[in-house]
Amino acid sequence: MQMADAATIATMNKAAGGDKLAELFSLVPDLLEAANTSGNASLQLPDLWWELGLELPDGAPPGHPPGSGGAESADTEARVRILISVVYWVVCALGLAGNLLVLYLMKSMQGWRKSSINLFVTNLALTDFQFVLTLPFWAVENALDFKWPFGKAMCKIVSMVTSMNMYASVFFLTAMSVTRYHSVASALKSHRTRGHGRGDCCGRSLGDSCCFSAKALCVWIWALAALASLPSAIFSTTVKVMGEELCLVRFPDKLLGRDRQFWLGLYHSQKVLLGFVLPLGIIILCYLLLVRFIADRRAAGTKGGAAVAGGRPTGASARRLSKVTKSVTIVVLSFFLCWLPNQALTTWSILIKFNAVPFSQEYFLCQVYAFPVSVCLAHSNSCLNPVLYCLVRREFRKALKSLLWRIASPSITSMRPFTATTKPEHEDQGLQAPAPPHAAAEPDLLYYPPGVVVYSGGRYDLLPSSSAY
């Protein structure tokens, strides 16, 4: 890592003893590592820069870090820290509420028993729920100027849980994309398979082999996420930096003949490749193949004068293609936009650790100000996942409306969760509640509360949603 030229190093050696300076100088990679782990300690860098008395890259005299304005800069950094802490608490609250709601709906509707996709959604909600539980620790750390008050054991636990659930969340998103492609492609492959696991390889029986395969895949995903988080579990520790205790990942000075910089670069390379590049590539590939497959089936059905998807008109195929395209846009863009800034800055740090590019003032300022914002954006994906993968689906919106109405009006107990004109998606057909038995003749419109219509015969329906599709 190139932090100063030869003249700067000579000046520093005159100002301080070599051993003491070398010790302080060696802490810079640790602070950069902490910044690249979860946004921790990134704002401690100006203090260390000032403590070392480094000459600035632009030749300015030492005494203030790059871009620093003295007390004004300190106030700005304090405001940034407080803002980040508030964002962490907001993300934590929204993530807990959203993922708990998804878990409740899945359990009450037994959705995970009906579909491998829903099994992945349940595990994704559990993963994001565990992930947001770590945010209060990072929020407190930010508010305390990145001091770690929880001890060494909690440093290891929180770091490992954060890393493991980050990997697990990305892996489950990838598994859902692959499963969605397989399900839709299998349903459209031949009309002879109609009625035998259409769009849902699990069918309705827990004994089906595909359902067991989905469960086995979930176990493998959790195991792989735990394996990927082992470096955080092993090397996370508390380190004294200028009299303050910080929680960071610190590799030994020499490990298997390699220095600390090499292992830090390898650690972050794993994060970028295994936690972003490969999953994103698989997600994009699956959705591109899915869109192309549906388009080819539509073209073949139109050319042959036959229906697409086992007797369906080409108009239905066009609507399916439109929904898939919309799903592609939402899923890929949300994942890409939330994680790209964080992973781009991490990639920059990898190049510096491998001495491919020099340490610069621009990188320093990005680590101080931009990296914490990118971490917040990446963490917000845990709030978006419940919305993107559950609540935008029609049957879950209906179930949520039913739940809210039952809470608001407990006296109405015979309300149906779905309207007579709305069919649940094929993978959850078994979730529709049976209609209540026919009752005595009643007026056509007995009662009309907001959102509910009571028809003759004792049938209670929710009003159809204008946003349903």
From Swiss-Prot:
InterPro entries: CCR1-9-like, GPCR_Rhodpsn, GPCR_Rhodpsn_7TM. GO terms for cellular component: plasma membrane. Keywords: Cell membrane, Disulfide bond, G-protein coupled receptor, Glycoprotein, Membrane, Receptor, Transducer, Transmembrane, Transmembrane helix. Residues 1-81, 141-156, 237-270, 351-356 are extracellular. GO terms for molecular function: G protein-coupled peptide receptor activity; G protein-coupled receptor activity. CDD domains: 7tmA_RNL3R1. Glycans are attached at N36, N40. Residues 103-119, 178-215, 292-329, 378-469 are cytoplasmic. GO terms for biological process: G protein-coupled receptor signaling pathway; neuropeptide signaling pathway; positive regulation of cytokinesis. Coiled coil: none annotated. Disulfide bonds join C155-C247. Expressed predominantly in brain regions. Highest expression in substantia nigra and pituitary, followed by hippocampus, spinal cord, amygdala, caudate nucleus and corpus callosum, quite low level in cerebellum. In peripheral tissues, relatively high levels in adrenal glands, low levels in pancreas, salivary gland, placenta, mammary gland and testis. PANTHER family: CELL ADHESION MOLECULE, RELAXIN FAMILY PEPTIDE_INSL5 RECEPTOR 4. Receptor for RNL3/relaxin-3. Binding of the ligand inhibit cAMP accumulation. This is Relaxin-3 receptor 1. It comes from Homo sapiens (Human). The gene is RXFP3.
